[in-house]
Amino acid sequence: MNALVRRLLPGLASLLLLAGCATAPLQPVNVQWQSHQVTLEQIQHYQLTGKLGYIAPDQRQSFNFQWQKSPQKLSLRLSNFLGQTVLNLQVDEQGARVETYDDQIYRDQDAQSLIRNLTGLDIPVEQLEDWILGLPTQATHYELNEQNTLATLTKLASTEEWHVEYQRYQAIEWQHQPIPLPDKLKLQQNKTSIQLVISQWTLLP
């Protein structure tokens, strides 16, 4: 395991156990789905919190996460079960920046590479901007469930093929109307698996 992770996560060996949920029957794209896509693309400023479970051949971890997105910036904070910050990532037009627990600052143009080099975690941050909303932007293939929201998608990102399974949605109010947003999804790439369970969505104007 990466030395930085060992220092940051003393004694953290438990994996977040998250039960799977069956996907609803698939249904072809229709006008309702196209309208839903347009609505999702209008959401530019939001926050969410939840749990992230990470499984790879060389490590298994569980984190609390906070995700904030605005038109100018994306931020991701991972913390352990004691509330100690493991990763504090900021991404803007200047690139990606990570500030560590001991006030060291690291930069890279690619957020995924920066996280991987510092922690050994392979998290497709920039693709998650759309995936976490339920948007299949430039996906190689995607399928819908019977509610006309995403059931699965597959996308080649940075030479890696990621498969995303949307296991559960919740209704969140947006512009005085409820819209379905993901609250449980699983990302898979080769032998790496990431489980996200979202406990709170906050959509901002």
From Swiss-Prot:
InterPro entries xrefs: LolA/LolB/LppX, OM_lipoprot_LolB
Pfam families named among the record's database cross-references: LolB (PF03550)
Origin: domain of life: Bacteria
Localization: Cell outer membrane
Residues bearing a lipid moiety (S-diacylglycerol cysteine): 21
Presence of the UniProt keyword Transcription in the record: no
Entry membrane topology: Lipid-anchor
Keyword Transport: yes
BP GO terms, sorted: lipoprotein localization to outer membrane; protein transport
SUPFAM superfamilies associated with the record: Prokaryotic lipoproteins and lipoprotein localization factors
GO CC, alphabetical: cell outer membrane
Primary residence: membrane
Protein family (similarity comment): Belongs to the LolB family.
Function (record text): Plays a critical role in the incorporation of lipoproteins in the outer membrane after they are released by the LolA protein.
Quaternary data: Monomer.
Protein's UniProt name: Outer-membrane lipoprotein LolB
